Amino acid sequence: MREAIIKRAAKELKEGMYVNLGIGLPTLVANEVSGMNIVFQSENGLLGIGAYPLEGGVDADLINAGKETITVVPGASFFNSADSFAMIRGGHIDLAILGGMEVSQNGDLANWMIPKKLIKGMGGAMDLVHGAKKVIVIMEHCNKYGESKVKKECSLPLTGKGVVHQLITDLAVFEFSNNAMELVELQEGVSLDQVKEKTEAEFEVHL
């Protein structure tokens, strides 16, 4: 299920892109890049993230914004968070791939908190959804109770309003334009009826 999401998201990466991968599921996209010159950026001050380290090759001083150990590629650079967010807010990041708790049919995103649950803070997502040239959200289509996370309106606090360009789930791929949500692709083995059944949001079909 997650593998299908990650592999589909990796297809959106293009040669020469500067890309920020959000915490959690999005970080796994970096492992799918092979033979392309993609530069991955992290909010904690790193340009040039590599794949996850193999066992025995972990450097505890090399971490991403989610405090996971990583590797770096030749030519990687390190800098402070102020410079990192200047890159993001200045529009220098081509693509941000973020996780999501809910996405609405208008392209609203909620991905930073659930009320009454302890959180560490909002992180860099609010900057990324407004600063990156394109925002892709990847997530499972339904929550653990089987309820759709693709909503008419988000019920959780918003990260950004009308900021999502593309949504990739384990069932389908949606694109957003002019406040309309369009189904453009089905995941392998998934039917249109399944997507309609599991989606609260209203969408147009452009398969």
Swiss-Prot record:
<dbReference type="GO" id="GO:0008260">
    <property type="term" value="F:succinyl-CoA:3-oxo-acid CoA-transferase activity"/>
</dbReference>
<feature type="active site">
    <location>
        <position position="43"/>
    </location>
</feature>
<keyword id="KW-0808">Transferase</keyword>
<dbReference type="InterPro" id="IPR004164">
    <property type="entry name" value="CoA_transf_AS"/>
</dbReference>
<dbReference type="InterPro" id="IPR004165">
    <property type="entry name" value="CoA_trans_fam_I"/>
</dbReference>
<comment type="subunit">
    <text>Heterodimer of a subunit A and a subunit B.</text>
</comment>
<comment type="similarity">
    <text>Belongs to the 3-oxoacid CoA-transferase subunit B family.</text>
</comment>
<dbReference type="InterPro" id="IPR012791">
    <property type="entry name" value="3-oxoacid_CoA-transf_B"/>
</dbReference>
<protein>
    <recommendedName>
        <fullName>Succinyl-CoA:3-ketoacid coenzyme A transferase subunit B</fullName>
        <ecNumber>2.8.3.5</ecNumber>
    </recommendedName>
</protein>
<dbReference type="Pfam" id="PF01144">
    <property type="entry name" value="CoA_trans"/>
</dbReference>
<dbReference type="InterPro" id="IPR037171">
    <property type="entry name" value="NagB/RpiA_transferase-like"/>
</dbReference>
